């Protein structure tokens, strides 16, 4: 079975970590010790990852570097840098996990660009949180002194927000499919892909300053690679109804129609669980195949139907 797995950027930079290379390497090693179980069980694996914390950190490093007369790079370049950095980590740590299990599989990462619509309303309405969490006082300083868009992120603190256009298709689609069909484990579409547009007048591709939601990007990837299932890994075993209320209930399986009803009822937090559910719905609707939401340490159990939220066609 071919599985596309979307790994959250926060899984590679956990809360409380300073964000050093060693921190992220340790988190990645822990994550790959779980991911390798999917391969060991006989499945084909395509993996994508978030990059919110990493992209935000690189962006802030660019801003700080300007004080030393080091030119800052555009946001889309920051995204490309995270694909290279996290691609290296994921390749090395998954390769190590495969070796430890005696599994002979090659892992390759691809810098991936995603076409977006230049008229996407997201460019006028930034919603995507990136970077570290700040206190209310720090957020007010960054908003007033630096002009950043800062919002509260699901009760966890304040973060910078940037445009998040809907991904259309990947520039490297055929290369990814060729590698997957040849038996490679492919790491691609990091952070949803580098957002690009086609300048029709110049007939060339250009990057744009935005961050694509990695889950929506992953759903496009899953459909493009003919995945048998699409899995989003987050920090909870199942999506929940009545989140943080006395009658909180885990969703074990639901149809597209049922999940759409839950969205209308406001059960999923914007910027947190909501985009994950929306990405799953997009995949299930376009392919007729199931999507899963679960925690990293429940991934294999979810594939076996023992844990997780499974979304199926009507």
Curated annotation (Swiss-Prot):
EC number: 2.7.2.2
Major enzyme class: transferase
Pathway assignment: Metabolic intermediate metabolism; carbamoyl phosphate degradation; CO(2) and NH(3) from carbamoyl phosphate: step 1/1
Secretion signal span: none
Catalytic function, reaction form: hydrogencarbonate + NH4(+) + ATP = carbamoyl phosphate + ADP + H2O + H(+)
Gene from which the chain derives: CBK
Assigned GO CC terms: cytosol
GO biological process: one example: arginine deiminase pathway
Protein name: Carbamate kinase
Subunit: Homodimer.
UniProt record similarity statement: Belongs to the carbamate kinase family.
Organism of origin: Trichomonas vaginalis
Keyword vocabulary terms for this entry: Arginine metabolism, ATP-binding, Kinase, Nucleotide-binding, Transferase
A molecular-function term among this protein's GO annotations: carbamate kinase activity
InterPro entries per UniProt: AceGlu_kinase-like_sf, Asp/Glu/Uridylate_kinase, Carb_kinase
Regions that span the bilayer: none
């Amino acid at each position: 079975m071919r599985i596309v797995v979307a790994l959250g950027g926060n899984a590679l930079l956990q809360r409380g970590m300073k964000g050093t290379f060693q921190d992220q390497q340790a988190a990645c090693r822990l994550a790959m010790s779980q991911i390798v179980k999917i391969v060991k069980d006989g499945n084909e694996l395509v993996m994508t990852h978030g990059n919110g914390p990493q992209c935000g950190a690189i962006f802030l490093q660019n801003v700080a570097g300007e004080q030393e007369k080091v030119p800052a790079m555009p946001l889309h370049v920051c995204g490309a840098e995270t694909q290279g950095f996290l691609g290296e980590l994921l390749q090395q740590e998954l390769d190590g996990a495969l070796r430890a299990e005696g599994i002979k599989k090659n892992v390759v990462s691809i810098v991936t660009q995603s076409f977006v619509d230049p008229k996407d309303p997201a460019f006028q309405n930034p919603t995507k949180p990136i970077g570290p969490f700040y206190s209310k006082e720090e957020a007010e300083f960054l908003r007033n002194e630096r002009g950043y868009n800062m919002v509260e992120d699901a009760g966890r603190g304040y973060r910078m927000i940037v445009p998040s256009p809907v991904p259309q298709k990947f520039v490297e689609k055929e290369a990814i499919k060729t590698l997957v069909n040849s038996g490679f484990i492919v790491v691609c579409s990091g952070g949803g892909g580098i957002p690009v547009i086609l300048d029709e007048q110049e007939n060339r591709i250009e990057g744009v300053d935005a961050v694509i939601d990695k889950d929506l990007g992953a759903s496009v990837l899953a459909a493009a690679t003919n995945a048998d299932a699409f899995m989003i890994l987050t920090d909870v075993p199942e999506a929940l109804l009545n989140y943080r209320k006395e009658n909180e209930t885990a969703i074990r399986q639901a149809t597209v129609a049922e999940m759409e009803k839950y969205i209308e009822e406001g059960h999923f937090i914007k910027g947190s669980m909501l985009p994950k559910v929306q990405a799953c719905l997009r995949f299930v609707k376009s392919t007729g195949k199931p999507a899963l939401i679960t925690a990293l340490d429940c991934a294999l159990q979810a594939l076996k139907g023992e844990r997780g939220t499974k979304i199926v066609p009507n």
